[in-house]
Amino acid sequence: LVFSYAEIIGLDVKLWRDSVGAPLNIQPVIERLMPKDKTKPPVNYDLRINNIVVRRSRLSYDVKSKAEADRRFDRNHVEITDLKADILLPRIKNDDYVIDVKRLALKERSGLEIESFGGVFSASTSRLSVSGLRLEMPSSLLEFADMEVTYDGWRELADNMFNLPADVKLLDGSHIATSDLACFVPVFAGMNRRVDVSFDMSGPLSDVRVRNITAATYEGDMRLSLSGRVSGLPDVGN
């Protein structure tokens, strides 16, 4: 089944839950979409959409029992406006998915602004890959080398996600501006420092080998270079 074009204009999605862990307000809809008889094999499908365009859309999420944080990003109260996207779905079929995000842009009430996010995401029963991953903010740019994770079936991916090895590399030319991070670190508000960054890491998340992390200010008054190993990341905070 092939669709040439789909357009979504003025979408306004409001998600909420009464407290952390409580069901979402759309839980009845989710339950209706779930198969009634889980012993039946899944229905075969093969879908392609050549272009999905999203413009002037909004998305909000609220945990009603939580107070709102001032002047910073709050994961319990997210309000996205001016959502734009250009997405291709070259292949959506049983156990084989390809999503090509040409551009996704948005603004969040905390001041977070993403001018462009894109990449090609592929998943099958044996391989998960990301290519051309790129994030642009008003004064920041992050570009990643292609990434790939291999596994033996969806069950292994779900059960051993933190134990699957991968290489993650942030390419030279990437940089972060403090002004773009003020929504996470309020003290950065009013500051405008650029830091050139790159890193090269490998291994499972539970035992990361850091070949190199480099950070240097654009003005040249600070440079930091690190290497080493980090273990136990999935358990941090437990």
Each model region followed by its residue ranges:
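Solvent-exposed loop/turn segments connecting transmembrane beta-strands
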Residues: 108-114, 137-143, 216-224
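Secondary-structure transition motifs
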Residues: 1-95, 112-114, 140, 144-151, ...
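Short, intrinsically disordered, charge-balanced linker/junction segments flanking boundaries
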Residues: 1, 231-238
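Short sequence motifs at beta-strands and strand-loop junctions characteristic
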Residues: 111, 189-193
